[in-house]
């Protein structure tokens, strides 16, 4: 597959050897399955703010603190620099949350780094190496559903104890 423009710098730097296929496209990012040496990972390319379909971005960012007063003022004013800082803050918050949730014992993809709006992370697969299906595509027994629900509730408790929760 042809390497998308936003992934080309990672390929040039040797972080990605090959783009295998697109995995999904969502309101905030496009995700591709990539090969890094002998390991298969995924690359999440965040969409630029102008191309995202976040209808309530202001609410999403509400309560996120920025310690650097210059950055905070620029973000409040909405200058070009401020918008870039807001993007960087939002992307770094996701990476930080992944590390924090992992330390709390929640099963999340391991991040390998965020490079110019591209998050390189672990691809979660089943025993055969197949990508996990979307929940809407899964059928399971009532017993399996109860077991999975109990596990998810344990993860929610761990997330709350870590001071984080996610709507997805």
Map each language-model feature to its residues.
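Conserved ATP-binding subdomain of kinase catalytic cores across diverse folds
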Residues: 1-131, 161
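AlphaC helix of the protein kinase catalytic domain
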Residues: 129-141
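Gly/Ser/Thr-rich active-site loops/lids in small-molecule metabolic enzymes
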Residues: 144
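Short C-lobe core helix of eukaryotic-like protein kinase catalytic domains
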Residues: 153-160
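Catalytic-loop of the protein kinase fold
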Residues: 161-168
């Amino acid at each position: 597959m042809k390497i998308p423009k936003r992934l080309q710098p990672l390929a040039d730097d040797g972080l990605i050897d090959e783009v295998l296929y697109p995995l999904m496209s969502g309101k905030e990012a496009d995700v591709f399955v990539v090969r890094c040496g002998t390991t298969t990972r995924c690359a999440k390319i965040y969409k630029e703010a102008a191309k995202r379909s976040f209808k309530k971005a202001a609410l999403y960012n509400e309560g996120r603190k920025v310690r650097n007063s210059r950055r905070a003022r620029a973000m409040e004013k909405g200058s070009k620099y401020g918008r870039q800082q807001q993007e960087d803050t939002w992307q770094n918050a996701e990476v930080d949350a992944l590390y924090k949730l992992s330390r709390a014992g929640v099963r999340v993809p391991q991040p390998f780094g965020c490079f110019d709006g591209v998050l390189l992370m672990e691809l979660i697969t089943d025993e055969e190496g197949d990508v996990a299906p979307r929940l809407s595509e899964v059928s399971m027994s009532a017993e399996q559903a109860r077991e999975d629900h109990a596990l998810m509730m344990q993860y929610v408790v761990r997330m709350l104890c870590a001071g984080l929760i996610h709507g997805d």
